Amino acid sequence: FPLAAVTGRAEIMDAPGPGGLGGTYGGSPIGVAAANAVLDVIEDENLCGRANQLGNRLKQRLESLREKAPQIVDIRGPGFMNAVEFNDRTTKLPSAEFANKVRLIALDKGLILLTCGVHGNVIRFLAPITIQDSVFGEALDILESAILEASAGN
C-alpha cells in the first residue's frame, strides 16, 4: 500500500500554501494502517533489540579474527548494519583484492557478500533481522572460514 512522508526544516516545510505540498500517496488510510501495523510488530517483537544482538554477535566474531587476519583494519556499524574493512597486510593500503577474495571464497561456500567502499575494500552486512539463529550461525562460520582462508593465502 502506498505511503510517503516528507520531512524538513520548519521554515521550508511551512513555506508552501495550503495544498502546495502533497503527492499521489497523500491520504491513504490503508497505507497508514499497514505502516502502524509494521511499527507494532517492530515493538512487539523487539526487533530493534534483535538488531543490536545480531550486530554484536557479528562484530564479536569479526573481532575474534583480528589476530589471525591482520588485514582486518576496521569493524563498524550500528545495530545489524555493519561493515568490515580490509587493508593489505604488507603495504597497509586499502585492499579491494583481499575483500574480493573473501567474497569469492564465501560465495563458493554458499554465502553471498557485497564489497563496497571508496576503495572497494569493505564488505558490508545488512541481513534481515528476522534471520533464524541457525542460519546466522552458519553464515558466521562461512564468513570466518572465508576470511581465514583468504588471509592464509595472502
What are the residue ranges of the model-derived segments?
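Conserved N-terminal phosphate-binding loop of PLP-dependent enzymes in the Aspartate aminotransferase
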Residues: F1-N154
